[in-house]
Regions:
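Domain-terminus/edge residues, biased toward the C-terminal soluble/receptor-binding domains
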Residues: 165-169, 177-395
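Short regulatory "switch" loops immediately downstream of catalytic or recognition motifs
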Residues: 1, 22, 99-103
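Bacterial N-terminal signal peptides
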Residues: 16-30
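N-terminal secretory signal peptides that target proteins for export/translocation
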Residues: 1-14
C-alpha cells in the first residue's frame, strides 16, 4: 500500500489546517478534546446547521419538559397542512369554551386572549402561537384538526417520530406540564432544522417581534430577537418545573447555528447564556469546503492498463467545520494499492482518504475511480512485464 498526500489537498491546506471534518452521510464530524465551554443550562445542544456538526452538547439526550417550545411542533403541523392545501391562512376557526378555559387568561398560562364563540383567522392563530405563545390558539387549532387536543397530541407524536424525533412524546398542543410530555434538546434542534429547511415560506413568523390581536399588543418572548446577533427564531419555553428554555437559530454570513437550552434559572439567564453560546459557535468555528462532489483528489498508477494513470475522485461534497484553535494537529493522506491493477470500472472504490487527529480514531473516506481503464491485450501485457523485469518500469 502507498500513502500519498493529495496534490489538491496540499495546495488547499498549505497552512496544515487542523480541521474538524463532518461527513454526511459519509463525511465525518469530530471535535478535538481541547475544545471546551461550559454552560449553566441543564441541557444544551449547539449545531452548525449547514454541516450538522455538533459544536457543543450537555445532557442533549436527557428527557426534559419542553414547555412552550412544544409549540414548534404544533406550528409544524399547521405548516404541513398549508403546504398540502388542506388549510389556508384565511380559514377561520371557532374558539371553544374548552380552549378559552384551558388556554385563556384565567388559566395562568400564556394566552392570545381569545373570546369564546368568536371565529378567528388561521393566520392570526398562527401568529398567536408563534409570537404570543398563546395556549388558547394552540387548543383552537388542535380541536379543529383532530377530534380533541389529546387526539391532536397523538398525531404530533406520530409525526415527530417520522421526522426523527425518537425521544419525544406530546400529551398536549401547548407544552402544559404533564409528566409524560417529554423531549430532548437534540430532538428540538432537529425539529428547528426541519422547520427552517421544510418551510422557508412560513419561517418568517418566528422573527416577528410583536403581534397585536383584539387591540392587545404582545411582544415575542425570544430575547435574542432584540440583540445584534442575527437571530431569526424560534421559540421560548417556561414552566416552574422546566424553568427557562429557548430554541434559537442565528446566521452569520453563510453559516447558520441552531441552539437549544433548557433548565435556566431566570429570564436574564435565558437572555445571556444563549447569546454567549451562539457567539462562541460563530467565533471559534468556521466552515470550509474541501472538495466538491466528483472532484479529483489525486491520481494513481495503473498496472497493465491501457492508461498509465487513473484519477481518484470523491463521490460527494466534503464540507468541514473548522475549529479555529484545533489547527496543526491533523494529518491527511490517501492510501491505495500501487499500482492499481486493470481493468478498472469508473466508480470503483479504489482508494481511501485517511484523516487522523491526535486522540481520535482514524477516519476514512472512500475515493472512486474517476474513469474506466481497460486491461491491456496479451502482447501489451507481455511487453509491460518485460519492461518491469529489465528496467523496473510498471506502466
Amino acid at each position: 500500500m502507498l500513502a500519498k498526500r493529495p496534490k489538491r489537498l496540499l495546495s488547499a491546506l498549505r497552512a496544515a489546517f487542523r480541521i474538524v471534518l463532518f461527513l454526511s452521510p459519509f463525511l465525518f464530524g469530530f471535535l478535538p478534546p481541547a475544545l471546551a465551554i461550559e454552560t449553566i443550562a441543564e441541557q444544551a445542544f449547539l449545531i452548525d446547521m449547514t454541516t450538522g456538526e455538533v459544536l457543543f452538547e450537555k445532557n442533549a439526550d436527557q428527557p426534559m419538559a419542553p414547555a412552550s417550545m412544544s409549540k414548534m411542533m404544533t406550528a409544524y403541523m399547521i405548516f404541513e397542512r398549508l403546504r398540502d392545501g388542506s388549510l389556508t391562512l384565511e380559514d377561520t376557526f371557532t374558539v371553544s369554551e374548552n380552549a378559552w378555559r384551558k388556554g385563556g387568561a384565567k388559566s395562568g398560562g400564556s394566552t392570545m386572549f381569545l373570546e369564546p364563540g368568536k371565529r378567528v383567522k388561521l393566520e392570526d392563530l398562527l401568529r398567536g402561537i408563534i409570537v404570543q405563545s398563546g395556549n388558547d390558539a394552540c387548543i383552537v387549532v388542535a380541536e379543529a384538526l383532530a377530534s380533541s387536543e389529546a387526539a391532536f397530541a397523538e398525531k404530533m407524536t406520530v409525526r415527530a417520530k417520522e421526522l426523527g424525533l425518537q425521544n419525544t412524546v406530546f400529551k398536549n398542543a401547548t407544552g402544559w406540564p404533564d409528566p409524560e410530555h417529554l423531549t430532548t434538546a437534540q430532538d428540538l434542534a432537529l425539529l428547528a432544522k426541519r422547520t427552517i429547511t421544510d418551510f422557508a415560506e412560513y419561517y418568517h413568523y418566528y422573527a416577528e417581534k410583536e403581534f397585536t390581536y383584539n387591540t392587545i399588543r404582545q411582544i415575542n418572548r425570544n430575547p435574542l430577537l432584540y440583540k445584534n446577533i442575527d437571530v431569526d427564531g424560534l421559540k421560548t419555553g417556561h414552566t416552574v418545573e422546566s424553568e427557562y428554555g429557548l430554541t434559537a437559530s442565528a446566521t452569520n454570513g453563510d453559516r447558520r447555528l441552531i441552539l437549544v437550552v433548557n433548565g435556566l434559572a431566570t429570564k436574564k439567564d435565558r437572555s445571556r447564556e444563549p447569546e454567549r453560546l451562539l457567539n462562541w459557535g460563530f467565533r471559534d468555528f468556521n466552515n470550509y469546503r474541501l472538495f466538491s462532489a466528483g472532484e479529483e483528489v489525486t491520481e494513481a498508477d495503473v498496472w497493465l492498463g491501457k492508461e498509465d494513470k487513473v484519477p481518484l475522485v470523491i463521490e460527494r461534497e466534503m464540507l468541514l467545520t473548522i475549529a479555529r484553535n484545533a489547527r496543526h494537529k491533523m494529518k491527511v493522506t490517501v492510501t491505495f494499492e500501487n499500482p492499481i491493477p486493470a481493468p478498472i470500472a469508473k466508480g470503483d472504490p479504489v482508494a481511501k482518504l485517511v484523516l487522523t487527529v491526535p486522540g481520535r480514531d482514524k477516519l476514512e473516506v472512500p475515493l472512486l475511480a474517476g474513469a474506466a481503464v481497460e486491461r491491456l491485450g496479451l502482447f501489451g501485457r507481455l511487453g509491460t512485464a518485460l519492461k518491469a523485469i529489465l528496467w523496473g518500469e510498471s506502466g
